[in-house]
Amino acid sequence: MMGRPEGLKLIDENGKRIDGRKKYELRPIKMEVGVLKNADGSAYVEWGKNKVLAAVYGPREIHPKHLQRPDRAILRVRYNMAPFSVEERKKPGPDRRSVEISKVIRGALEPALLLHMFPRTAIDVFIEILQADAGTRVAGITAASLALADAGIPMKDLVAACAAGKIDGEIVLDLNKEEDNYGEADVPVAIMPLKNDITLLQMDGYLTKDEFLEAVRLAIKGAKAVYQKQREALKEKYLKIAQEVEGNE
């Protein structure tokens, strides 16, 4: 959260936000599954101005062998922001933030995966942020979960994610860049809706206990809406495949 420019209002007296949305409204979201031919699974997500590509490879053999787990697969996640993804060009390669978010995303996805079915292997997830506009970790989790499902990795449920936050004293859904920079708090949440489980819950900023609970409830509601979009994107891909198969008969 940064010091804000003088006179900047993030939300007006009618509850209208800086980008025209209402308090509890998500940014526009578009999802597509199976976008990379050479990956075992892949997905592309546009979320507001965020553009995120996720690719999954595996389960595959691990080298060196001492990294293998005899009882389960290991999940390796690499979250990377492309140098051109933000206005100020960033240095290529992982920085401390990317390493931290990679770990956070791995922790959010792991509870959904039946890793014991693939001992001594690795499942590699690559998340590339092509354009960043606040909420890249929840968009990354959402894209990675779709790519894992597309790769046919057995899962208890899809993982859907969304954030809520506080701007000008109001709890709102799905912060954009200005709200994230100049707001008071951000609460990203990831869930497995069918299991009623939370796999990620973080908070950046300051909230009272009541505000925190309201933000979590709102983020869960947003994640459930994201989950429906994930299911539609997967359905769309497999309807396409079915039509192609029928056409070839």
Swiss-Prot record:
Keywords: Cytoplasm, Exonuclease, Exosome, Hydrolase, Nuclease. CDD domains: RNase_PH_archRRP41 (cd11366). InterPro entries: ExoRNase_PH_dom1, ExoRNase_PH_dom2, ExoRNase_PH_dom2_sf, PNPase/RNase_PH_dom_sf, Ribosomal_Su5_D2-typ_SF, RNase_PH, Rrp41. It holds the Pfam family RNase_PH_C. GO terms for molecular function: 3'-5'-RNA exonuclease activity; RNA binding. It is an enzyme of class 3 (hydrolase). Its EC number is 3.1.13.-. It is found in: Cytoplasm. Transmembrane segments: none annotated. One of its GO terms (cellular component) is cytoplasmic exosome (RNase complex). Disulfide bonds: none annotated. Its main location: cytoplasm. SUPFAM superfamilies: Ribonuclease PH domain 2-like, Ribosomal protein S5 domain 2-like. GO terms for biological process: gene expression; rRNA catabolic process. Catalytic component of the exosome, which is a complex involved in RNA degradation. Has 3'->5' exoribonuclease activity. Can also synthesize heteromeric RNA-tails. HAMAP family: Exosome_Rrp41. Component of the archaeal exosome complex. Forms a hexameric ring-like arrangement composed of 3 Rrp41-Rrp42 heterodimers. The hexameric ring associates with a trimer of Rrp4 and/or Csl4 subunits. Belongs to the RNase PH family. Rrp41 subfamily. This is Exosome complex component Rrp41. It comes from Thermococcus kodakarensis (strain ATCC BAA-918 / JCM 12380 / KOD1) (Pyrococcus kodakaraensis (strain KOD1)).
